[in-house]
Swiss-Prot record:
Record-annotated TGS domain positions: 1-61
Organism: Proteus mirabilis (strain HI4320)
High-level lineage: Bacteria, Pseudomonadati, Pseudomonadota, Gammaproteobacteria, Enterobacterales
Catalyzed chemical reaction(s): tRNA(Thr) + L-threonine + ATP = L-threonyl-tRNA(Thr) + AMP + diphosphate + H(+)
Subunit note: Homodimer.
Name of the protein in its database record: Threonine--tRNA ligase
Amino acid sequence: MPIITLPDGSQRQFENAVSVMDVAADIGPGLAKACIAGRVNGELVDACELIEQDSQLAIITAKDDEGLEIIRHSCAHLLGHAIKQLWPQTKMAIGPVIENGFYYDVDLDHSLTQEDLETLEKRMLELAKTDYDVIKKRVTWAQARETFVARGEDYKVAILDENISQDAHPALYHHQEYIDMCRGPHVPNMRFCHHFKLQKIAGAYWRGNSDNKMLQRIYGTAWADKKQLKAYLERLEEAAKRDHRKIGKQLDLYHMQEEAPGMAFWHNDGWTIFRELETFVRCKLKEYDYQEVKGPFMMDRVLWEKTGHWENYKENMFTTSSENREYCIKPMNCPGHVQIFKQGLRSYRDLPLRMAEFGSCHRNEPSGALHGLMRVRGFTQDDAHIFCTEEQILSEVNNCIKLIYDVYSTFGFEKIVVKLSTRPEKRIGEDALWDIAETDLAKALTDNNIEFEYQPGEGAFYGPKIEFTLYDCLDRAWQCGTVQLDFSLPGRLGASYVAENNERKVPVMLHRAVLGSLERFIGILTEEYAGFFPTWLAPQQVVVMNITDGQADYVQKLVKELQDAGIRAKADLRNEKIGFKIREHTLRRVPYMLVCGDKEVESGKVAVRTRRGKDLGSIDVNDFKEKLLQEIRSRSLHQLEE
């Protein structure tokens, strides 16, 4: 007679073992219809799962995050069902859930086309709209293997042979004549899987190993209802318009080429943005009392062996040899900063020591993972390392948090999700030190009125960390900022200071990043602003145009005056119609276009127009200059009269 306790604390008693769906039906027919799965004593299970003992139960519906994930997983099975009907010789590999959707890797004897994708999606919808029940059956390992051998599903057989114990009882999910194997849970009926869209096809090696066969990966998205799907597809459409690669080309910011994969060739306007960003961060470093240093970008492999990077990270490191010595091009700045700390005798009076660098780093990312500025091999990292005592951890973390929020607010990012990762099972350092560190990190967040969630066991082996994830205007997540405590590296590399009692002690080190990679952050900003960079960051801030040759001298004089004031201004004296010039510079997202005709020359004014098409009328040159300088100096996100 199991007693079921629901999330609101109410209880229901049943005579015999009862399924999740039975409990939902007992509560009400509406909930039974909406029931996708259940969470029994914290574990996600299928709606058909029997509960035999007293248990805590939460009914999962499409309104829950878990419910949506299950819908997506079941859509992957639906894809398998449809593709086997269309091309029966297809061999199914794996079909997991990913962010916003799912994919399935398939082995097919022909290359899928866009037309095939449309045919496949149509068949999926036809099948889903029959609202068939999904039947789950537990079988022995041998029965599962026999099933997939008979069906010619070589990849499923390989999964059983290599990944599943022969003592296990795998779950087989029956979609009419189609059978798939999965840990589940899955939807009980395909009425939950009507709102999906197949998106693209890519190549993927079986097991992610380039020595294995290349499979075709079919990506799709799935949502709980039509409205959610429509909104997501609209966001994708908007994201495509904002793609930094497309805008980067339109605005002539940078380019990539095959001879230097994952490394940007910065053009003048793109490099202007880069340098402005660097200058801004540099001002903040001075404000928050950091030293700026510069370490070599290449160091002997021996040093990387001492740090542990060679053992754990060598696949991602570029190397070169000279005079019988092997060198590693640095993937990160921290070992170099420890070397600087070690020069000379350090005292507790020198701490905290905040050391920042715009470090040129390189990581050997897989070529298939490279993506514009967002995923590169060569990048500039804005990280810093703070050497401090255990007693200074709290104040230093506080200082880091203030800096991070100070910077993010300048760019208009308001939604920031914060996570605190705590000690993993395998770690170094005494528990007492971990206690201090975790308590101080949490207190610093609380002191700054920052909501956060714990990620138990997700910290690095050498210390806990805080992660700051930005959400952009399309609600996409970008993990940029980190504050990571490190109890290991300074000791590994022999760093120490003289404590107040004249004993040698190893400093605590904080790794701190705000923007992360400057290249990636420029990519994020390009998409956030759709290329309409705030005036202070815009590569060209003002363009001054004449209507006829008679205003050329006035235009050149005005441009020089603006340039002398530190404003990035240029003249456009081409013999083109003024409407043509305005349109061209509007497409280039120049914040201000100044038009000079005879009337403006006579009055000492300029006709001001913004890139958004707003006509600000005739403004006195000095008034405009002062207002513009104020906008630039304050790093305002808004243009004049916005």
